[in-house]
C-alpha cells in the first residue's frame, strides 16, 4: 500500500514539475546496480529518520546515515551556481552514468551540476550497498525515534 502512495506522490509531483520520475528512476537504478536483489522504492522509502521524503533527528543506523548524507549532498548542490533547479529541486536533474557489474561511473559528458548530482546518487548507492539493512527501522515511528 505504501508503494502505491509513493507512486501516486511521485506522479503528482512530476505532473507539477517537482520531481522527475526519470531522475528518481536513475537513483533507483544506481541502487539496483550496487544491490541487484533490492527493491529500492520499497526497501529504502520510509526507512529510519532520513530515507524517503524529508528527514530529521539523529540517524538510527549506518543506512539511515547514508540517506542523511545524500540529503546533505543535495542541499550542497542547491548552493552551486551551476545548479539552478526548477522549483529548487535536485530530483529534477537528469544525468548520464553507466553500470558495469556493481560499478557505477558518472559520465564525463555531464555538465557541472549533473556531475555533482550523479556523484551524490553514486555515493549514496555505494553507501547503501555497504550498510546493513535493519528491518526494524522500516516504517519507523519518526515522531518517537527521530
Curated annotation (Swiss-Prot):
Reactions performed catalytically: a 1,2-diacyl-sn-glycero-3-phosphocholine + H2O = a 1-acyl-sn-glycero-3-phosphocholine + a fatty acid + H(+); 1,2-ditetradecanoyl-sn-glycero-3-phosphocholine + H2O = 1-tetradecanoyl-sn-glycero-3-phosphocholine + tetradecanoate + H(+); 1,2-dihexadecanoyl-sn-glycero-3-phosphocholine + H2O = 1-hexadecanoyl-sn-glycero-3-phosphocholine + hexadecanoate + H(+); 1-hexadecanoyl-2-(9Z-octadecenoyl)-sn-glycero-3-phosphocholine + H2O = 1-hexadecanoyl-sn-glycero-3-phosphocholine + (9Z)-octadecenoate + H(+)
Single biological process term from Gene Ontology: positive regulation of podocyte apoptotic process
Active-site residue numbers: 70, 121
Pfam families: Phospholip_A2_1
Localization per record: Secreted
Cofactor: Ca(2+)
A GO cellular component annotation in the UniProt record: extracellular space
Main location: secreted
Protein name, as recorded: Phospholipase A2
Species annotation: Canis lupus familiaris (Dog)
